[in-house]
């Protein structure tokens, strides 16, 4: 690991975190459901699936691009800790059904969107 690679992850991660801050601020909650977090996790999952789909289907994506976009940007954009805290808060507030919906929506949507991005990268 060299300093240039660390800088790529740092800049990509910072950019992703700023995008997350903006996007989750635009749609923070809808009837106690944390839409903003679902949006950023879904977008990051799709982008990461697309990036690795491009690589799988033969596009030569440089290590630097993978570090900046995959590890950095997508890592900074997505937020497992916020998802976990919001789910915990919903449970604490007695919103059990909403908490369960949040868990299923985040897990199923993000896995599906990685798959979709991967498949769409082939075209």
From Swiss-Prot:
The protein's matches in InterPro entries, at most eight in alphabetical order, are given as: FluC
Q: Which UniProt keywords apply?
A: Cell membrane, Ion channel, Ion transport, Membrane, Metal-binding, Sodium, Transmembrane, Transmembrane helix, Transport
What gene, per UniProt, encodes this protein? Answer: fluC
Name the membrane topology term.
Multi-pass membrane protein
GO terms (BP aspect): cellular detoxification of fluoride
One GO term in the molecular function aspect is: fluoride channel activity
Under catalytic activity, the entry for this protein gives: fluoride(in) = fluoride(out)
Q: What is this protein called?
A: Fluoride-specific ion channel FluC
Q: How is its activity regulated?
A: Na(+) is not transported, but it plays an essential structural role and its presence is essential for fluoride channel function.
Where located? Cell membrane
Q: Which residues cross the membrane?
A: 6-26, 38-58, 68-88, 100-120
GO CC annotations on file: plasma membrane
The record ties this protein, via HAMAP family, to:
FluC
**Pfam families, per this entry?**
CRCB
- Family the UniProt entry places it in: Belongs to the fluoride channel Fluc/FEX (TC 1.A.43) family.
Signal peptide coordinates = none
Q: From what superkingdom does this record's organism come? A: Archaea
Role summary? Fluoride-specific ion channel. Important for reducing fluoride concentration in the cell, thus reducing its toxicity.
* Binding residues for Na(+): 75, 78
Location, primary (coarse class): membrane
């Amino acid at each position: 690991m060299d300093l240039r690679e660390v800088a790529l992850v740092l800049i990509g991660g910072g950019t992703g975190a700023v995008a997350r801050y903006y996007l989750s601020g635009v749609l923070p909650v809808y009837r106690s459901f944390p839409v903003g977090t679902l949006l950023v996790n879904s977008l990051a999952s799709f982008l990461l699936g697309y990036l690795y789909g491009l690589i799988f289907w033969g596009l030569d994506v440089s290590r630097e691009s993978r570090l900046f976009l995959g590890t950095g940007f997508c890592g900074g954009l997505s937020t497992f800790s916020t998802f976990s805290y919001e789910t915990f808060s919903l449970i604490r507030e007695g919103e059990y059904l909403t908490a369960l919906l949040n868990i299923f929506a985040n897990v199923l949507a993000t896995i599906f969107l990685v798959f979709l991005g991967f498949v769409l990268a082939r075209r």
